[in-house]
Amino acid sequence: KRDYKTVSEWKKAYRDKAKLMNERGYRELQPKEFYRAIFPEGSLQSREHDGKGNIIATQIRPSGKGRTKQWVIDDSLNMLDKVIGDSFGLIPPLSFYGKTHTKENAHQLFAMAIDIDYVGLQQLKNMLKQFGNGVQLCPTFLVSSGKGVHLYYLLKEPVELYANREKLLSALKEDFIRRHWNDTSSIRPDN
């Protein structure tokens, strides 16, 4: 097994994965199109006090490069422009009440997102084969994230994030991770 160590090796691996996905018919989406699919129009707050949550996007800065910032993104998705193209940003498939990304403020879950690290070209080929032959549940979206991939499974309806559902949803996500992150999907399986 190959363990990529340099930034240039990972960038090449990223380009190779993008080429493979394109060859296999996976269409690249623009960021606003992707997030609109996750958060359908009307599902987020469009005016104050309408009872809907917002996206909380987080930009994480490398040490010494400024402060971490959070952006509140409403149903217009206009503030997405602040984080698109950032080298390390997080936008979970959740809506939140308030202006901070905390468990207490989480309102609705729109998709299950699974992060699999250290996915090289061969591991991506393995995953695509498993999705195609039904061994693994095919995600709605497959996102290349540099050193890995994110698998997004859109929910038919958003799930309200009540405290009594936390254990069940956490267990479901852990089951997805254990099933998908293995010695055929990652250079470094999650043991």
What does each model-found stretch correspond to?
Residues 1-111, 121, 127:
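DNA replication initiation on ssDNA origins
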Residues 114, 137-164, 191:
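Histidine-centered divalent-metal-coordination microenvironment in nucleic-acid enzymes
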Residues 172, 187-191:
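Chromatin/DNA-recognition segments of nuclear transcriptional regulators
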Residues 117:
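Anionic group-transfer/hydrolysis microenvironments
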Residues 123-134, 155-183:
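Helical (often loop-to-helix) elements that flank the catalytic cores of nucleotide-handling enzymes
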